[in-house]
């Protein structure tokens, strides 16, 4: 939905915030924008191919010449509009000079980084960059959300600088020191070499600088575009002046340097493609969409599509499937390996997409309302319920600080956190030493430990979420997250055990050779770390093994805990509906989350023991079959140990009556049946919500002259003794069924109520109730 801000005042005197209006008419502009950005990505990849054969200045001159020709032809800047004054011509000249400099930086960065990285770094809208600079250099940067967006942007740039392997050796061989195509490229390469960074990293910094210059250039051009009669007229005149500025330089280059182009006629279509896709189409579509849509929407959709297109072409541009999109012919039997996709650039693209989405989002200063109609007086009525349930954003440092405080407050989460820190420390030591000694075994085991840390993180997050307060949407709170966490951890372990079992069976047939040089010290170190975890989480195993369901403990001493119950009811036509809640201090019980974490640690411990045993047999006796045999034994143990966890978690998720409380609940229902004034009960439902909450609902039929609150108190007390600490009791009388029969209920419902009514007129001993 498109958001528009209205200046009308509400009846109460408040100012109306953004109001949702239909956005179906914007679909065509969104599609047009996405199509233009897709073609711009094609044009920039084509530009990179052209720059391999054409000098940088010649390339910019031809692009400016073609753009000036089309824009002067379309806009007619000399025959339409007011006459441009001499002072304005001077400003247009300065505008053209700065535009040429930015183009030089842009396309030189393209030659250094390739089209994929150039699109990721340079194709950010002014809205995104201004929001980024506002967060970095002003005190009112837009709140925590904008701060996260700025952090994502910086992380994306760092990923390109540090974790992106961009074929540096090929680039060094391509332009050895002392040989460059022209004085301009020599100067730029000298500056990059002076900074002490590789060409690819220098290109990243150059494109970031060009991006900032582009945004400042656009901001400074706004007043000039108004003075000369619009942005389109300014662009036409500026491109024309740029051609005149670059013409002498191009002539000198043509006379002093040897051209790499074999046939200029073969480059006509590639240049037309670049001019139309990169300059003309993108400029006009941006102009139209910025008028029809909000700038934030334009930036968000445009950035997302061009980044996705960049990743797509970065992987398939040299593939035969893209030959139809390429205007410039690819040399036969040639597959380029420069500027290919890497893990760093993919991660960077993800962070760029996230940052563009966050930084381009408008700061909401009013409530978001939907027009639902008009009052009899003609005043517009708006619904603001959508924002009423939204939570306010919170700064990341404060969220981390409060989360850490909550983690350290409770025993379970504190144990997980301490063991996670120990596990991470061992993991990074293992990875560092593996990289230092070039040991593939240490590196692979380090990443295996890192995967185990992810299970600990999930368990820690689940332990933290269980203490979150209930909200309007999640009215029961987040206690069941620990059940889900344990269930997912159990599934992970079962999948791991299955694959280990299958691999072990395959290795039994053909045992491979094993390098045991580093296995023993690594396994001993892992065993020590995991034994610490076994000691830390053993209480979870003991609770889970002793009682498979969920339960709560009550203490009679006041200083151990507290227990209270309350009920409230109302009677309308002799029908009472009451809720009784008893809150009991939880002293233990099955914690599925902790059991899942414990089983993960146990599996790692068994793995370390198995590696030590198999390594000993291999080193002493040369029994290669010991490794798959130990793996088979360990996989079987893991599988069998996970089954009870999954069984208990499934029972909780399926709302089964807690097994250990079945007898108590059955006895409690018999006691309820014997309460004075109670005729019968129906629809008793009891289930385990979490490790410390057993919930239940029950309908109790009573005689007409009984006091509802007394029944509620007695039923609540009986079921609380049976372990139900979150109870809803509905009291029903004979007049209630008569009242419901008179309503517009279905025939089957009325028939069932009537039959139940007849059964209520007699006690079990046959006595008739008057």
Swiss-Prot record:
Amino acids binding Zn(2+): 448, 452, 600, 604
Molecular function (Gene Ontology), one example: zinc ion transmembrane transporter activity
Database matches in Gene3D superfamilies: Cation efflux protein transmembrane domain
GO terms for biological process, alphabetical: GPI anchor biosynthetic process; intracellular zinc ion homeostasis; zinc ion import into Golgi lumen; zinc ion import into organelle
Chief location category: Golgi
Subcellular location: Golgi apparatus, Golgi stack membrane; Cytoplasmic vesicle, COPII-coated vesicle membrane; Cytoplasmic vesicle, Secretory vesicle membrane; Golgi apparatus, trans-Golgi network membrane
Superkingdom in the source lineage: Eukaryota
Reaction catalysis annotation: Zn(2+)(in) + 2 H(+)(out) = Zn(2+)(out) + 2 H(+)(in)
Lumenal side: 51-53, 117, 171-190, 257-264, 322-339, 437-445, 502-517, 619-622
Region (His-rich loop): 539-579
CC terms in the record's Gene Ontology section: cytoplasmic vesicle; endoplasmic reticulum membrane; ER to Golgi transport vesicle membrane; Golgi apparatus; Golgi cis cisterna membrane; Golgi membrane; secretory granule membrane; trans-Golgi network membrane
Keywords: Antiport, Cytoplasmic vesicle, Golgi apparatus, Ion transport, Membrane, Metal-binding, Transmembrane, Transmembrane helix, Transport, Zinc, Zinc transport
Membrane topology category: Multi-pass membrane protein
Region of interest called Disordered, as start-end residue ranges on this chain: 548-586
TM helices/strands, residue ranges: 30-50, 54-74, 96-116, 118-138, 150-170, 191-211, 236-256, 265-285, 301-321, 340-360, 416-436, 446-466, 481-501, 518-538, 598-618, 623-643
One Pfam family this sequence matches: Cation_efflux
Biased composition (Basic residues): 558-570
Stretches of the chain found on the membrane's Cytoplasmic side: 1-29, 75-95, 139-149, 212-235, 286-300, 361-415, 467-480, 539-597, 644-770
Function in brief: Together with SLC30A6 forms a functional proton-coupled zinc ion antiporter mediating zinc entry into the lumen of organelles along the secretory pathway. By contributing to zinc ion homeostasis within the early secretory pathway, regulates the activation and folding of enzymes like alkaline phosphatases and enzymes involved in phosphatidylinositol glycan anchor biosynthesis.
Family the entry assigns: Belongs to the cation diffusion facilitator (CDF) transporter (TC 2.A.4) family. SLC30A subfamily.
Quaternary structure and interacting proteins, as annotated: Heterodimer with SLC30A6/ZNT6; form a functional zinc ion transmembrane transporter.
Name the UniProt record assigns to this protein: Proton-coupled zinc antiporter SLC30A5
Taxonomy of the source species: Eukaryota, Metazoa, Chordata, Craniata, Vertebrata
Gene: SLC30A5
């Amino acid at each position: 939905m498109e958001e528009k801000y209205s200046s009308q005042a509400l009846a109460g005197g408040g100012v109306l915030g953004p109001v949702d209006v239909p956005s179906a008419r914007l679909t065509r502009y969104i599609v047009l924008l996405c199509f233009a950005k897709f073609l711009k990505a094609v044009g920039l990849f084509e530009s990179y191919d052209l720059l391999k054969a054409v000098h940088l200045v010649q390339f910019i001159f031809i692009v400016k010449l073609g753009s000036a020709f089309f824009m002067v032809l379309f806009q007619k800047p000399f025959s339409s509009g007011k006459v441009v004054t001499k002072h304005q011509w001077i400003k247009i000249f300065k505008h053209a000079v700065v535009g040429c400099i930015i183009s030089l930086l842009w396309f030189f960065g393209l030659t250094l980084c390739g089209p994929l990285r150039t699109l990721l770094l340079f194709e950010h809208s002014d809205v995104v960059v201004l929001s980024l600079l506002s967060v970095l250099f002003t005190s009112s940067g837009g709140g925590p959300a904008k701060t996260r967006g700025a952090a994502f942007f910086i992380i994306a740039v760092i990923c390109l600088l540090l974790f992106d392997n961009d074929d540096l050796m090929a680039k060094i061989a391509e332009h050895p020191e002392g040989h460059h195509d022209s004085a301009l490229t020599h100067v730029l390469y000298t500056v990059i070499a002076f900074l002490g960074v590789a060409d690819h990293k220098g290109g990243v910094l150059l494109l970031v600088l060009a991006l900032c210059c582009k945004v400042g250039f656009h901001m400074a051009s706004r007043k000039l575009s108004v003075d000369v009669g619009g942005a389109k007229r300014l662009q036409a005149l500026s491109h024309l002046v740029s051609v005149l500025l670059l013409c002498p330089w191009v002539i000198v280059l043509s006379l002093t340097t040897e051209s790499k182009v074999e046939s200029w006629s073969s480059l006509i279509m590639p240049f037309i493609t670049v001019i139309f896709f990169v300059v003309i189409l993108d400029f006009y579509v941006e102009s139209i969409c910025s008028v029809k849509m909000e700038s934030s929407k334009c930036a968000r959709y445009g950035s997302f599509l061009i980044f996705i297109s960049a990743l797509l072409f970065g992987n398939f541009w040299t593939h035969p499937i893209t030959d139809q999109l390429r205007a410039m012919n690819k040399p036969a039997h040639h597959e380029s390996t420069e500027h290919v996709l890497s893990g760093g650039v993919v991660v960077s693209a993800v962070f760029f997409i996230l940052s563009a989405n966050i930084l381009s989002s408008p700061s909401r200063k009013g409530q978001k309302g939907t027009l639902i109609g008009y009052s009899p007086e003609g005043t517009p009525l708006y619904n603001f319920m959508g924002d009423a349930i939204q939570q306010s954003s919170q700064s990341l440092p404060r969220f981390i600080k409060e989360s850490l405080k909550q983690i350290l407050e409770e025993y379970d989460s504190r144990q997980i956190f301490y063991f996670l820190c120990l596990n991470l420390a061992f993991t990074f030591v293992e990875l560092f030493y593996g990289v230092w000694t070039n040991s593939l075994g240490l590196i692979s085991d380090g990443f295996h430990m890192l995967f185990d840390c992810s299970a600990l993180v999930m368990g820690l997050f689940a332990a933290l979420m269980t203490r979150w307060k209930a909200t309007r949407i999640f009215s029961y709170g987040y206690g069941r997250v620990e059940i889900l966490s344990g269930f997912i951890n159990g599934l992970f372990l079962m999948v791991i055990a299955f694959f280990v079992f299958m691999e072990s069976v395959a290795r039994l047939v053909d045992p491979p050779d094993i390098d045991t040089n580093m296995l023993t010290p690594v396994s001993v170190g892992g065993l020590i770390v995991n034994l610490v975890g076994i000691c830390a989480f053993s209480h979870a195993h003991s609770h889970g093994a002793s009682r498979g369901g969920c339960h709560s403990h009550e203490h009679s001493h006041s200083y151990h805990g507290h227990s209270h119950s309350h009920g409230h009811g109302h009677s309308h036509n002799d029908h009472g509906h009451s809720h009784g809640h008893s809150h009991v201090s939880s002293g233990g019980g099955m914690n599925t989350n902790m059991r899942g974490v414990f089983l993960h640690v146990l599996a790692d411990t068994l793995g370390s023991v198995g590696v030590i045993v198999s390594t000993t047999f291999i080193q002493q006796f040369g029994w290669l079959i010991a490794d798959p045999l130990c793996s088979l034994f360990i996989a079987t143990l893991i599988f069998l140990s996970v089954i009870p966890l999954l069984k208990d978690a499934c029972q909780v998720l399926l709302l089964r009556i807690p097994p250990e409380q079945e007898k108590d609940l059955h006895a409690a229902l018999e006691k309820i049946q014997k309460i004075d004034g109670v005729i019968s009960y129906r629809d008793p439902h009891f289930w385990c919500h979490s490790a410390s909450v057993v919930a239940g609902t029950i309908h109790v039929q009573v005689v007409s002259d009984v006091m509802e609150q007394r029944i509620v108190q007695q039923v609540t007390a009986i079921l609380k003794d049976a372990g139900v600490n979150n109870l809803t009791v509905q009291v029903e009388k004979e007049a209630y069924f008569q009242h419901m029969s008179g309503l517009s209920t279905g025939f089957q419902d009325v028939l069932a109520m009537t039959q139940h009514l007849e059964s209520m007129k007699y006690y079990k001993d046959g006595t008739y109730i008057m």
